[in-house]
């Protein structure tokens, strides 16, 4: 990997070289939930993963690591809205394509890290983000009004996807 100037990005580069990715945990503040995201999947042609919620750090990081490995093993991103169950639990997780808000408000360090590489190596600055959404203990997702409040997190899906879901619900 390229030598970084900024110590923060030097550490990220070392972790990516050793582990395949870095996972950042951003603590909750005021009314904003904590969130976790990967840095490094995009260097291998896969989306970065984002998970929003005030969840325990180690299990959340384990989820992002496992899902990243699943993507890299198959050589492709998850399909939009794909349900995955990497640990064989009772309920599936969902993976959604995200809007540019994910990059601007949640994964800014990815862009900054890639930009620092781009200036030296020509690594592309652009990247995609997919959001991992956890169900509540009863299997309900944030769109369900009965979803437990701890699991009611913003889902950063493009408006066109949401409208398509609403139309399909009305048709059935």
Model-derived regions: residue spans:
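Acidic, proline/glycine-rich low-complexity IDRs
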Residues: 1-29, 43-46, 54-172
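A glycine-rich, hydrophobic loop/mini-helix early in the fold
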Residues: 32-43
């Amino acid at each position: 990997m390229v030598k970084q100037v900024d110590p923060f990005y030097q550490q990220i580069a070392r972790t990516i070289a050793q582990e395949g990715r870095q996972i950042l945990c951003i603590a909750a503040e005021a009314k904003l939930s904590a969130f976790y995201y990967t840095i490094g999947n995009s260097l291998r042609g896969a989306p970065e993963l984002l998970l929003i919620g005030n969840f325990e750090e180690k299990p959340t990081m384990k989820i992002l690591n496992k899902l990243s490995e699943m993507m890299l093993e198959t050589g492709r991103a998850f399909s939009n809205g794909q349900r995955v169950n990497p640990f064989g639990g009772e309920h599936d997780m969902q993976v959604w394509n995200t809007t540019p808000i994910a990059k601007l408000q949640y994964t800014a360090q990815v862009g900054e890290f890639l930009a620092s590489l781009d200036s030296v190596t020509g690594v592309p600055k652009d990247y995609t983000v997919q959001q991992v959404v956890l169900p509540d203990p009863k299997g309900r997702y944030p769109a369900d009004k009965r979803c437990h409040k701890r699991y009611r997190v913003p889902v950063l899906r493009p408006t066109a996807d949401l409208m398509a879901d609403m139309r399909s619900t009305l048709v059935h």
